[in-house]
Each structure stands twice: as structure tokens, then as C-alpha cells.
Amino acid sequence: DKPFEEGGIEARPLARGKYILVGASLCGGRAYAVLEKFFRTFVVQAGGEDKALYEVLKKLARAAMNQENPVEVSTLFNGTRTDPTLRDSITNISENNFTPEGITYGVLHGMIKELYDMYQQIHQGTGIQVSHLVASGNGMRKNKVLQEISSEMFGADLSLAVYQEEAACGAAVSSAMAF
């Protein structure tokens, strides 16, 4: 059988003739780093200290979590695997939500929405449904708001991967399965 592949969803081989369906964004967590750089540049230009603002961003995002009519951010800074010319956009801006809090929450929501849209392609093509999320990466590990957005959007409980070096661990497990 040929595994499902469509619209940027790839079937990557596992051991024993199995496949894993992968929807991989080109920007992912880097979108949050771009946002942090934006705010940091502003702070420095305004005479503030040049230091990481991730803790501040977490507070801003938390403050906007239940905002009515939130800012919508598409985090396609580098396009997609199928169309690298696509770019980011910010929509649904009003005078009430065009705030640092609203933009920060919008970026986090947009990061997960890109992944959710990929999941929807897989679901529509295969019938596979999410029953539980296992998340990896420092962006997810260090940001409870991002975890909550993920769980809410996918409608499933979320756990963090047990090991922090996820790629190396996955390669080791895959190699061990081949024997």
C-alpha cells in the first residue's frame, strides 16, 4: 500500500514497513523568536536593556488568552513546503485587540493553527483522529500558554515528551527497532 501523502503531508518510513505521517512547518517556533526580536528591538530603541523578553511575552499572551475577537496571525514567515512564497499576515485587528498582548497571543495561536491545519489534512485523508498530544521542543516545553492553546485547539490532553533531545532519542529508538 502507498501511504497517504498530500499537500505537504509526508509519509516518512519507520522500521518494519511502517510510516509516520508528518506535517512540518518551515517556521514553527522560530515565529516566536521573530516576535521576541521585534519587541526587543523596540525596547532597545526606546532606551531599555537588550535582554531576552520571553518571560514578558508569556505574561502578555496569558493576559490575552480569553480576549473576544482576538488578532489572527498566520505565522508563515517562510511560506510552506508546498508554497515557499506565502507570507505571514495579521488580520482581525481592532483598536481593542491591537496590543502587545493581542499580537503575542495571536502569534502563539497562529503557530498551533498551522499544525492543526496539517492535522486536518491528515484527518480528512485518512480518518485518523487525535486522542492525545505528545509535544516536544523547548518552545512548547517552556510555554504553558502554548501548551494550553494546543490542547484546546486539538481537543485533546497534552503531555510533554519524556526526553528533551527528541530528535536524537527518536533516531536511537528507530535504529534499535531495526535490529
Residue spans for each PLM region:
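N-terminally biased helix-coil "hinge/interface" segments that flank
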Residues: 5, 123-124, 179
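Activation-segment/catalytic-loop signature of the eukaryotic protein kinase fold
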Residues: 63-169
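Residue-level recognition of short, structured coil/turn motifs
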Residues: 40-47, 127, 155
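FAD cofactor-binding and catalytic pocket of flavoenzymes
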Residues: 47-72
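Glycine-rich phosphate-binding loop of actin/hexokinase-like ATP-binding domains
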Residues: 1-45, 68-88, 160-163
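Hydrophobic alpha-helical scaffolding
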Residues: 21-25, 29, 43-51, 63, ...
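Well-ordered alpha-helical segments within folded domains of soluble proteins
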Residues: 30, 170-173
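Short, hydrophobic alpha-helical segments
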Residues: 39, 172-179
